[in-house]
């Protein structure tokens, strides 16, 4: 299990693909993990790119330290991880929570960012979104895995995907029981502080915005806010996909990323 201690935290990471290829970092969603969440992307994206998957602090196989988390702290952790791996610059991608980390990384570490890919993510938290995540926090505080599963799944996947993937979701329900609930709460509390729309005009890097058409939680209305703030960005609507577009429409998801990266110097 490869780990490195950086910025006071031990982070789990994986590297895939040619050692001399440009590096592409994938930042996970809130309760995703590097070891299992990118199963539909790893092979396709690592053919021509050095793919870096990792768990941020509080996630998966990385340390889950006590104390407050923030997107700024996650960005600092990622910068330290890249430095430890002797990676000067990278394409930075992130889905959902990982997209919020990616925004802050691009803002705070522009010299380390080759391009930016923001997927099913937000740059601000309005009251309706806050209430959804607060309902998750309520489940987490009660350490009720089944309630957390039931509260989150309808927001994370489209109805059609849920109907077609009962077995996959049953397995996922079991994994919810293994979550570190205090760490998940700290991640949610970090999310509540997201408020970067006014700074996005500072981003000069080539940017690609992707969003599932049926994403109910961080959908097109939030993606359009980001696109208005970064007018040079590409905008891609993934039709028929919910929030977890990397699982629901993996071929289109991968194709958009590869096409975007192919345009970069």
Predicted regions and their residues:
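Short alpha-helix in the alpha/beta-hydrolase fold that links the catalytic acid
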Residues: 205, 219-226
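Active-site loop/oxyanion-hole signature of alpha/beta-hydrolase fold enzymes
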Residues: 39, 43, 52-93, 255
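Acidic catalytic loop of the alpha/beta-hydrolase fold
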Residues: 213-218
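Conserved alpha/beta-hydrolase catalytic His-Asp/Glu region
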Residues: 127-131, 145-201
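Catalytic active-site module of serine/aspartate enzymes centered on a nucleophile-bearing elbow/loop
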Residues: 233-265
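Short beta-strand/loop motif that positions the catalytic acidic residue
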Residues: 203, 209-211
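Conserved HGGG/HGGXW glycine-rich cap/lid loop of the alpha/beta-hydrolase fold
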Residues: 7-63
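Flexible "cap/lid" loop of the alpha/beta hydrolase fold
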Residues: 100-108, 113-143
């Amino acid at each position: 299990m490869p780990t490195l201690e950086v910025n006071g935290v031990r982070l789990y990471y994986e590297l895939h693909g040619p050692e001399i290829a440009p590096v592409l970092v994938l930042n996970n969603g809130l309760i995703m993990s590097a070891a299992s969440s990118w199963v539909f992307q790893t092979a396709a994206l690592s053919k021509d790119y050095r793919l870096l998957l990792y768990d941020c602090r509080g996630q998966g196989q990385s340390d889950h330290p006590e104390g407050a988390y923030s997107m700024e702290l996650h960005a600092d952790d990622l910068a330290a991880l890249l430095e430890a791996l002797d990676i000067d610059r990278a394409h930075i991608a992130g889905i959902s929570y990982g997209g919020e980390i990616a925004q802050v990384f691009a803002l705070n570490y522009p010299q380390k960012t080759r391009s930016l890919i923001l997927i099913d993510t937000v740059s601000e938290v309005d009251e309706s979104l806050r209430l959804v995540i607060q309902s998750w926090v309520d489940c987490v505080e009660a350490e009720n895995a089944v309630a957390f599963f039931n509260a989150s799944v309808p927001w994370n996947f489209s109805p059609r995907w849920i109907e077609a993937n009962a077995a996959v979701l049953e397995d996922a329900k079991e994994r919810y029981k293994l979550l570190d609930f205090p760490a998940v709460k700290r991640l949610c509390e970090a999310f509540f502080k997201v408020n970067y729309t006014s700074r996005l005009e500072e981003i000069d890097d080539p940017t690609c915005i992707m969003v599932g058409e049926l994403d109910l939680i961080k959908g097109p209305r939030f993606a359009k806010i980001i696109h208005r703030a970064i007018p040079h960005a590409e905008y891609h609507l993934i039709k028929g996909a919910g929030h977890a577009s990397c699982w629901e429409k993996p071929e289109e998801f991968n194709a958009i990323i590869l096409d975007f990266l192919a345009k970069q110097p």
